[in-house]
């Protein structure tokens, strides 16, 4: 069975990787789909192309995982790709309430099912926005993201990391 794991992945975190790795064991193939919204274009830290490359690098060790992108309704992508199951990771009850609403809508308008996978407890506090915030101050994000994301974030905030390193050397 082939499934889709959608998200903005700006950037992919260790929590995403945890859910992905477990989904890859449960299903024949997982397509990581970077959803991009033209109305949110200025809000992304990484461009679509950068996010796709980070995902490819982070998932290259998983033979049954591929990377794609789409800029419309997820149910339209699912129909276009002939896929019927969405994978969503959950960190807390608050995620569940939101995701349940979306799952019901996806089922109603696109006849698509959603499978929820609970993130491991150690990743329940990690989000892409928190990782971006920590990285923007030069903080250590190495445990919170795969190596590909950490490298990309350090490049994006190279001046901050260089300044932080310089102050440590003094």
From Swiss-Prot:
Localization annotation: Cytoplasm
Cofactor requirement: Mg(2+)
Gene3D superfamilies with a match to the protein in the record: HUPs
Pathway(s) per entry: Cofactor biosynthesis; coenzyme A biosynthesis; CoA from (R)-pantothenate: step 4/5
Gene: coaD
Biological processes annotated in GO: coenzyme A biosynthetic process
Name of this chain's protein: Phosphopantetheine adenylyltransferase
Species the sequence originates in: Deinococcus deserti (strain DSM 17065 / CIP 109153 / LMG 22923 / VCD115)
Taxonomic lineage from the root: Bacteria, Thermotogati, Deinococcota, Deinococci, Deinococcales
Functional summary from the UniProt entry: Reversibly transfers an adenylyl group from ATP to 4'-phosphopantetheine, yielding dephospho-CoA (dPCoA) and pyrophosphate.
GO molecular function: ATP binding; pantetheine-phosphate adenylyltransferase activity
């Amino acid at each position: 069975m082939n499934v889709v794991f959608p998200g903005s992945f700006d950037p992919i975190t260790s929590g995403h990787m945890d859910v992905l790795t477990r989904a890859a064991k449960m299903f024949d193939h997982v397509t990581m789909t970077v959803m991009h919204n033209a109305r949110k274009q200025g809000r992304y830290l990484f461009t679509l192309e950068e996010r796709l490359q980070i995902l490819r690098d982070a998932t290259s060790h998983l033979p049954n995982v591929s990377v794609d992108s789409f800029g419309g309704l997820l149910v339209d992508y699912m129909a276009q790709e002939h896929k019927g199951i969405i994978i969503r990771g959950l960190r807390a009850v608050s995620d569940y309430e939101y995701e349940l609403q979306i799952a019901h809508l996806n089922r109603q308008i696109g006849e698509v099912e959603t499978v929820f996978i609970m993130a491991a407890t150690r990743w329940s506090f990690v989000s892409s926005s928190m990782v971006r915030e920590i990285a923007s101050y030069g903080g250590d994000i190495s445990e919170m993201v795969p190596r590909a994301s950490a490298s990309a974030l350090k490049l994006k905030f190279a001046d901050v990391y260089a300044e932080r390193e310089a102050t440590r050397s003094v």
